[in-house]
Amino acid sequence: MITPPLNPLRLPPLSLYIHIPWCVQKCPYCDFNSHAQKGTIPEQEYVRHLLTDLTADLSRYQESIQQRPLHSIFIGGGTPSLFSAENIAFLLHQIEQRIPFAPHIEITLEANPGTAEAERFLGYVQAGVNRISMGIQSFSDEKLQKLGRIHNAAEAKSAVGFARVSPLRSFNLDLMHGLPNQTLNEALDDLRQAIELAPPHLSWYQLTIEPNTMFAYRPPKLPDDDELWDIFEQGHQLLTAAGYQQYETSAYAKPSFQCQHNLNYWRFGDYLAIGCGAHGKLSFPNGKILRYSKTKHPKGYMRGEYLYEERDVSTEDRPFEFFMNRFRLLEAVPKNEFEQFTGLPLSAVDKTMAWALDQKFITETDRTWQVTEHGKLFLNELLEAFLPE
């Protein structure tokens, strides 16, 4: 029998994730819930379903949501920039009619450089979007072709130019390293070109081969572990020298430009989720923590079959779920947040923390835990120690 949490939960900040599943074509490395566009995308119909889905969630989970405003919205995909600014404006306006926005809400929209024009960027800003995340991935036309991207390097730089002169609050560039046959110099050249464009935020992550992707069926030749380490180490030095602060495993930002939406994920915050295959997490004052997901395929979703699955997060699973998120961040973890957001006493993790200290994976003060440089190298081993026996 599962022992209930000993303490009521403090409700964390609330975000909203919106999934738009269509893209121009499926990239060979992509394992996200995305569907290649065939004919005209039913934008208005899909937006209506998103709003119906949200309305149902606000009713179903009212005990959790209460009067909490949204601190961030992230519109991901797929390729959300395939949708018109008019439909994004209508969607955001209707969401605000249903749930209040916090005064400085961050609203991010993912964009593909191949679908970006100056007018479209301005339209998104007028719609209420204040942050754009662009999937650049590389500035090498050869590498972009191997990755199945629909844009080239010139289009990528042009799209970044639109973002820089727009009234956006911030923008992010997604860049990958460890690409097929990529050398150290090629990886660093990509990074230098990104830095020259001066984005406030850079997500710099390693390509991994995911199951059920084209790359999984036909694996390309990737850099080995030693080459990957050299790329990361020298790339990290480049970013730091350019004034970027690493605040998460793959995230770098200029001061005060961290992604608030992702910070809320990693700090074990709450997030509503609407759209095909979207995943949400909600806390309830009585101690319950719920995870849920939505129907993946657009056909089922647009039949009104929104909710796919719900599961309670057991007390045994909460330490792993909490630290799996928190230890991705480089900031110290406040002990009181573990108690407040999981409902568990500190004694629930005493043994594991003593082991982690002995292994020099973490340091500890009266108020915080902090992953060490050594601990970052063994992060998976550290996290596995929190799994229920």
Pin down the residues of each PLM region.
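C-terminal scaffold of the Radical SAM
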Residues: 3-6, 11-15, 34-63, 68-344
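Short, Lys/Arg-rich nucleic-acid/phosphate-binding segment
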Residues: 252, 366-369
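A short, conserved structural fragment
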Residues: 358-367
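Short, amphipathic alpha-helical interaction segments positioned at domain boundaries
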Residues: 376-389
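Basic, amphipathic "hinge/linker" alpha-helix immediately C-terminal to the N-terminal HTH DNA-binding motif
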Residues: 369-376
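Local cysteine-cluster metal-coordination motifs and their immediate loop/turn environment
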Residues: 21-34
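Short amphipathic alpha-helical interaction segments
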Residues: 343-355
